[in-house]
């Protein structure tokens, strides 16, 4: 059984617990992006051995094989289908299809104040893709919550809360048993414009110093670290002096493995661990990331050779802890 109780936290089968999760992209590093069940199992075994108990499928619908493995191995899952809604992050992104009519008939009639512009006969692609995901995975016991987006630019819109409400209601309609969250990074906008208030679980991406403010300003009485840390490190590389630094760059394009270096927007993991330990209303976190991945080699994210792998992973591309 799942319970999310205001001021008290998350209960699984009647026992309070904190999410000790990671965010993972869908790829398998040098093995590529095609599903390999043995490689997925290997990743999950490494994560489980270090104490991880939850996976956030950032930021795409998961492979059925991954969900089946999480059912089998006892992981909890946050399933997250979107990295953008109707407002673009990149030229070729999902915003091109979000409100476009799909080939699927509408499940319910459109409301007069409905945010979707294509009203009656066909679902938008956003709704159709959500419904397909929800119906596919709502009977999987590993799935404990749905996330309707990651750092969507729509947070900054005055109408953003309406889109969030629409997606939340689709989740509730198809699965009334699980809560809905979204990974928010525009905390001022999310709090001031009502975006965070319409979610069942407000998910904060980074901004660990804003958790307490969010808890006091929002009605849910809970805060989730939906994406945390983004500490950077390179396996076997140790920089001296060993000091806490943000955005540190070196001629060898590496980062220190002392876990003291982060990016300008992020922090070392100790901050997030303390939030979860000190506040019952903080229900845990999903660290960015469980495994390194190709792309986003911050702090060397300059589109220049030789940097091509992320440095965020607790475990690197070779499946060796950093």
State the predicted function of each range.
Residues 1-322:
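Extended substrate-binding grooves/exosites of carbohydrate-active enzymes
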């Amino acid at each position: 059984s799942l319970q999310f109780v205001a001021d008290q936290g998350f209960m699984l089968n009647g026992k309070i617990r904190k999410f000790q999760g990671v965010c993972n992209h869908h790829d398998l590093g040098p093995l590529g992006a095609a599903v390999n069940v043995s490689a997925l199992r290997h990743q999950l075994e490494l994560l489980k051995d270090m104490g991880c108990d939850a996976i956030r499928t950032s930021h795409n619908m998961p492979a059925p094989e991954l969900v089946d493995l999480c059912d089998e191995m006892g992981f909890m899952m946050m399933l997250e289908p979107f990295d953008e809604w109707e407002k673009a992050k990149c030229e070729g992104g999902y915003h091109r299809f979000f409100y476009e009519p799909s080939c699927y008939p509408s499940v319910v009639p459109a409301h007069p104040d409905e945010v979707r512009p294509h009203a009656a006969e066909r679902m938008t692609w956003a709704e159709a893709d959500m419904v397909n995901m929800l119906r596919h995975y709502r009977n999987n016991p590993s799935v404990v919550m749905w996330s309707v987006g990651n750092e969507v630019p729509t947070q900054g819109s005055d109408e953003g809360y309406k889109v969030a409400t629409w997606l939340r209601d689709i989740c509730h309609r198809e699965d009334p048993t699980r809560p809905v969250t979204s990974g928010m990074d525009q905390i001022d906008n999310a709090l001031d414009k009502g975006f965070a208030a319409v979610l069942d679980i407000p998910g904060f991406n980074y901004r660990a110093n804003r958790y307490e403010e969010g808890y006091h300003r929002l009605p849910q009485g809970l805060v989730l670290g939906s994406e945390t840390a983004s500490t950077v490190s390179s396996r076997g590389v140790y920089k001296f002096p060993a000091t806490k630094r943000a955005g540190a760059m070196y001629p060898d394009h590496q980062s220190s493995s002392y876990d003291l270096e982060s990016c300008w927007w992020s922090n070392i993991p100790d901050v997030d661990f303390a939030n979860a330990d000190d506040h019952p209303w903080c229900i845990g976190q999903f660290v960015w990331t469980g495994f390194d991945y190709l792309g986003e080699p911050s702090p060397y994210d300059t589109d220049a050779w030789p940097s091509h792998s992320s440095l965020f992973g607790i475990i690197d591309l070779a499946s060796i802890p950093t």
